[in-house]
Amino acid sequence: KQRHFVYYNQVIKPALVGLTGPWISGGIEFNWPQHHRPSTYLPTECTIEEFPDGSVTVWCSEVERMFRTKGMAGFTLYPGKAYLEIKAKVYNRTSLPQTFLWWANPAVVVHKDYYSVFPPDVNAVFDHGKRAVSSFPIATGVYYKQDYSSGVDISKYKNIPVPTSYMAINSKYDFVGGYEENVEAGLLHVADHHVNAGKKQWTWGCGDFGQAWDRNLTDEDGPYIELMTGMYCDNQPDFTWLQPYEEKEWKQYFMPYSAVGMVKNATKEAIVTLKKNEYKGEVILYTTSVYKSVRILVTCGGKVYLDSIHDMSPAEPVKESFALNGVEFDSLKLCVYDNNGKVLVEYEAEKKEIKPIPDPAKAAKDPKDIASIEQLYLTGLHLEQYRHATYNPTDYYMEALSREPGDVRCNNAMGLFLMRRGQFAKAQPYFEAAIATLIERNPNPIDGEPHYNLGWSLKMQGKFDEAYDAFFKATWSAAQQDSAYYALAQIDCIRNDFEKALEHIDRSLVRNWHNHKARQLKASILRKLGKKEAAATLIAESLSIDKFNIGCRFELYLLGGESAQQALDEMMALMNETTSVHSYIEYALDFANAGLYAEAERLLLLWVNKNDGIVYPMVYYALGYFASKSDDVLKAIDYYKKASQMAPDYCFPNKLEEVLMLQDANRLQPNDSKAWYYLGNFWYGARQHDEAIACWERSVELDDQFPTVLRNLALGYYNKRNRKEDALACLEKAFALDYERRFEVFDQWSLRQHFGVVYQRAAFGGKGYYVSERLHSGFGKRNESFDQYGRGYS
């Protein structure tokens, strides 16, 4: 067809669509660990892999900042195959359970003749969060505030006037796509439906609003829709758990196709439809590569209605008609075979039946209105799993604990909630309460998770002996063995007992062969034991699993020898200028969490030297912490001083280890105002507001000339303490210190609006005029306010 089967946007016009802002239309968007991908506009690590069969894979990888999970996608083209194969992997690098979603969204060109191609068993679609539902393809009610009661085919783009999402209910088919009737071509996605649960279409709509967004996002390439394919999820939001150090992987395929139109079934090899034209049946077949002597067979009850042989290629789809001879069309079975008798694709019509339309989701009840402790726990867990923005899961856990203080699940959940927010000591009694209930009648519980979590709360407090005991008890449960043995090996390394560490890391890997962090730690242990050849063999094997295992690549360098510099050069080439500083910190922490502080320092200094010493402040705080844990207090203080001198712009610590770093910096350098400021940022982001405000107040005591901490303190005073006058005073001082800072301008404007201080605001507005002009929302609000009170502007 000589066409772009994925929407090709010839210009880059970023719009404020993505979770963190900039976003462009076109191509295939990969949304993870949530929608839209927070790092959409950030660089990614990449490499190219070539194979003997002529296929080429481009790998992209990142360790994302929000939840510290790792995602990889390998894009492969094969000679003679008309599809793009995507091999994807997601890996939880953390010691705690995490959640993720993965939606791969190709954009496709749309016109009035475009329609979506959902599987034939899809009879209903959901809105986001399943808050609304519609029959499909014929909508018969109100959906997105549009009245479709007359019966409207919403699979057709021309029938959807407003921005609309719809996601299919469960399907037993492996495909979803879209088709342009005017050019007889479309795009199809194929993946195993057991994993690929999500099948969705999104459009800006064909009305005025949609056309406005066409202009926002492109100059000349026109409207598009997104065909969204969800792996391990069927809705947005819909999140799946990744247990500590767990990896999930899958394959998915995107392909152009022609002639078939409304697909009835598809595989990565072939796409087919079977339809009725008056008294005849028709088969249309498309294949993604060249096949000789393909057999098309249509039968019913042992009787053959079509049996034909064709040479196939993507350039030449086949259409075959056959007489029905009175047979019930929906009882026909279609099979397509290659010349070896292997089934390429098959289809048997769905039974005619009226399927029920599912109910939309219901909002969570207030905790006091939920009768059972189990439902309180499950509601709280759902809110955590789905990252709900307004409901607080702890309200449900604590309501349950008020009724039954020893409940295992809610105590464990509360402990995890606090652990995720850096409250290691506060989490400990909840885990202990869960364990007390578990062992009341049996010292050997079936569930080892509370022991494992207790181990981590103790380890993060530096209570290694107690943590060791808790982790060992957790290994009595098979579900915790891989993560608990890994934690034991870390403590063994901290104790310099590398023989015992090797025993434990091997047990961990037996339970989780793809634990990339355990592989790095085993390489480190083997090096420490002088078993360099075994370490090199392990590293080679590990890199065949994950080329972006930076810890293993660094270990290859640490092994020394003639190839050491080459190993370092290859690692640095992979971690080129696109690699985030946060990834360097992550990989350094992999070493530090096992007491390998010298190795952690060497790795992080690569970033420092690469940037001539001018780096993100947390780099030096990490280096200071590594020195402090190595009992080199003078070096630690020197690093902490350097950290305090780095530019504080956009420094938002969010790693649990960074709490320990900043607390240690405050211990050794109590007058470091920036360390208090950064720690306050962590606490506020973790919704530990009292701790945040206390840290910011201490920062201001030490340095009241830093406008951002004053601005942050104002937010805390106003939103969490109802200290409105103090909040306004902080903002006014922040603005006086630096009136060019846009957010202080906007925040002060907003706060004054709450006080009704309009003319004071107008007077201050001139000074910050060009700032608010740059911040469009602030500029519009300023003008709106002046107009409302009779003040003109120019």
Positions of the model-derived regions?
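TPR alpha-solenoid repeat register
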Residues: C410, P443-N444, P450, A484, ...
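Extended, loop-rich substrate-binding clefts of extracytoplasmic carbohydrate-active enzymes
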Residues: G26-A82, F209-T240
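A contiguous, surface-exposed recognition patch within enzymatic or periplasmic domains that forms
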Residues: R3-Y8, P14, R93-L101, N105-E247, ...
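Residue-level recognition of tetratricopeptide repeat
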Residues: L381-H382, L416, W456, Q490, ...
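Canonical tetratricopeptide repeat
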Residues: A413, N453, A487, L521, ...
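Acidic, contiguous internal or C-terminal segments within carbohydrate-active enzymes
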Residues: K1, C60-H111, Q252
